[in-house]
Swiss-Prot record:
Catalyzes the dehydration of methylthioribulose-1-phosphate (MTRu-1-P) into 2,3-diketo-5-methylthiopentyl-1-phosphate (DK-MTP-1-P). Keywords: Amino-acid biosynthesis, Cytoplasm, Lyase, Metal-binding, Methionine biosynthesis, Zinc. It comes from Talaromyces stipitatus (strain ATCC 10500 / CBS 375.48 / QM 6759 / NRRL 1006) (Penicillium stipitatum). The gene is mde1. It is an enzyme of class 4 (lyase). This is Methylthioribulose-1-phosphate dehydratase. GO terms for biological process: L-methionine salvage from methylthioadenosine. Its EC number is 4.2.1.109.
Length: 255
């Protein structure tokens, strides 16, 4: 995890943007990405999803991508701290990425290529959390079913909050929800290949768990990405508690 930046000092020092595109993050609309990302990050912090500078959030708005900075206290982010990229943009090398606004003294998110992977498949918002429940679920799946297994759960009302795939509606109560799991890597950007493979093998998924790390969740709108992330986190916590009681996650497997 990057060393934490004292974001309050950065804010006080002002900004010196090479492109002078401050207008991109200035809006009175609370739903504007530059306002919405800080608000979402504050909520995620209170929920324990982005503790200790971990995690991140990005929103695509037309041909622009708005991204929270890396290595900062997420609950303190302000609109002027947001990076803006042109979309589409190359994932690699990082030097080729088309930033059109870079706040001074802040580092672009290490999650950037993973966010771009989600946007390339049509997502409009991608959220990365370090939820304890997501981490615990990856450990339980590995111990019970092995490293190649997905997280699977059925016959729980909350799975109806997760899409079955683009244009395929939402999961039904009796369906089995499957979330792929990839291995963690020493550096965040190195997760990109694993995420791409998981999406290729599971083209309908809206989330990928990262073992011993957290989860990436995306949606067709920022609101959908947020509510899907909430539903998944609720399901992960429930799964941990069910395991304590010896209750199966996927009733369809026991029939």
């Amino acid at each position: 995890m990057p060393e934490a930046t004292n974001i309050q000092v950065v804010i006080a020092s002002g900004l010196d943007n090479e492109e002078n595109n401050d207008h991109l993050v200035q809006s009175s609309d609370p739903q504007h990405p530059a306002n919405l990302i800080p608000e979402m990050c504050r909520k995620f912090y209170t929920w324990g999803w982005v503790t200790g500078t971990g995690g991140g959030t990005s929103i695509r708005h037309g041909d622009h991508i708005f991204i929270a900075p890396s290595g900062v206290q997420k609950e303190l982010i302000q609109p002027e701290n947001i990076f803006v990229m042109q979309f589409p943009t190359p994932k690699y090398p990082p030097s080729e990425r088309k930033y059109i606004r870079k706040p001074k003294n802040l580092k672009p998110s290490d999650c950037t290529p993973l966010f771009l992977t989600a946007f390339e498949r049509g997502a409009m918002c991608c959220i990365h959390t370090h939820s304890q429940w997501a981490v615990l679920v990856t450990l339980l799946v590995e111990r019970i079913y092995g490293k190649e297994a997905h997280f699977e759960i059925s016959n729980i009302e909350q799975i109806k909050g997760i899409p079955k795939g683009k244009g395929k509606g939402m999961h039904n109560y009796h369906d089995t929800l499957r979330i792929p799991i990839i291995d963690n890597t020493p550096f965040e950007e190195d997760l990109t290949e694993g995420l791409e493979r998981a999406i290729a093998a599971n083209p309908d998924t809206y989330a990928v768990l990262v073992r011993r790390h957290g989860i990436y969740v995306w949606g067709d709108t920022p609101a959908k990405a947020k509510t899907q992330c909430e539903s998944l986190d609720w399901l992960f916590q429930l799964a941990v508690e069910m395991h304590k009681l010896g209750l199966p996650w996927d009733i369809n497997k026991t029939k």
